[in-house]
Each structure stands twice: as C-alpha cells, then as structure tokens.
Amino acid sequence: MEHTDIFLTHLHSDHTGLAPEIRGKDTKIFIGEKDLSHMPGPHSTFRWADSDDRFAAEGFPRDLLAILTEQNPAQGLSPIPYDGYLPVKPGDVFSYGEHRFTAVHTPGHTPGHMCLWEAETGICLLGDHVLFDITPNITRWMGASDSLGDYLQSLDRVKGLEVAELLPAHRSETGDLRRRAEELAAHHARRIENAWETIRRQPGMTAYEIAGHMAWSIRCRSWEDFPLTQKFFAVGEALAHLDYLEVRGRVTRREKYGKWAYDALTGDSNT
C-alpha cells in the first residue's frame, strides 16, 4: 500500500472500515466532503445517541433502540477515528497512470456519495448508488431535507454518462445503467404512492407505524416478525419517502403525544 491511494465512495462501514488500518505511510484517503462530517474523528458531527433520539421521536420504541445499540453492526464496526481524510468535491479529477477519473456527486444513499467516471474508457465505479440485484437503502440523513429527492436527481445524473464498464460495490457487475436507473426510480415512485396511501387511509400515525403498514419485499408474515435491524432500515426508508412527500406539500407533520404524526394532504401522491 506504500504507493496506493484510497477513494471511498461513501461513509458506510463496509466501505470505509479498514481504510485507515491498511494505509501506507504516504497513502491518501479521499471521501466526499459531505460525508466527511459523519466519519469518526475530530470533524464528526454524528452521534448514535442523537440518531436514537430522532428515531424515538418518530415512534420507534426506546427499548428496541436499546437492543439495536448492542446488535447493530454499523455501531460496533465503525471505522477507527482518523483525521487524515481528504474531502472530495464534485468534478474533482484523479489522474493515476493512464487513467483520469472524475468525481460525480450522487447524493441519496449518503449525502456525500461519490461515483468515479472516466470519460475516455467509460469505466464507472458506482459504489452503492446503483446496484443491479438489490435496491440501495435510502434513509433520512441529518442535514439533508430530502434524501430521496436527492437520490432520484442523482439517478438522472448518471443516466447521462457514457459508460462501457460498470463497477458497482455489491452483487452483479453487469447491467444496463440507464435501464436500471429507471427501474430504481419506478420502484421509489411505487413506494411513494404506497406511503401516501397508507397515511391517507389512516392519518395521524408515526413513521414507525406507517412503516408497519407499508409493503416490503421481505419474507415475514407481519411487522412484528421483522428482524429488528430490518425494522430500523424500513423506518429509515419510510422517513425518506415521508420527507419527499412533505417537501412537495403532499404530507404534513404534527406533534402528537410527544412524537411526530403524519397526515396526507389531498392530491396525487406522485405530484
């Protein structure tokens, strides 16, 4: 690793966890500037306790959050604190040997997610932005008012890239980027409608309750049967879709018994 630099597409532990440990003496570690504030270190503004407070305000039971604190691998396997990360801005260029990659900002999965694209060869390192066998998790992020809206715009952004070789971070490495981006956008359009219809049928629910009534692709008979970590992901996904609807005036949020409750406004959920 003495002559190797590291580019982190985003902050999640399965992408960043070992970077500070395997670096060489002169290794540079790059990450999107908007993800940098969430990385463990002196620059971090993220605290798991704050996340728990926000989820509790959305109806997630405190006792289940306490169990998650002990079981959640994202908490137990966070990268070691490191203060040498170098921030990446959209359009930054990385020249190594004969290759010249451009950083493409693709927020949504995380606020600072970055893809690397080389115009000459059409090589594109997608990170977790577009996956071909599974759908990237889109959740609410501190400091981002509309993660899902950001993600949908990012899908449009990569659809315009001329690509020849795709390198996603998980599962299948082959696929049609434009077609898959359109499939992911259609998936979220259906989930937006599902969230809005759920609230319309039963107004005044918390995000935790709304998630329990939404349709999910998981082999469980009921919300009660969901594994706890999957409940956490589902509520985060529900929140991203609720934020999308609220920003566009389709949903309103109010305080109810110390928690946030949601009501649907009239109109088409996809407007």
Stretch-by-stretch model annotation:
Residues 74-83, 100-192:
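Metallo-beta-lactamase
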Residues 192-198:
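His/Asp/Glu-enriched, well-ordered alpha-helical/loop segment
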Residues 1-95:
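Active-site HxH/HxHxD metal-binding segment of metal-dependent hydrolases
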Residues 90-93, 113, 250:
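Short, acidic/polar N-cap/turn motifs at the starts of alpha helices
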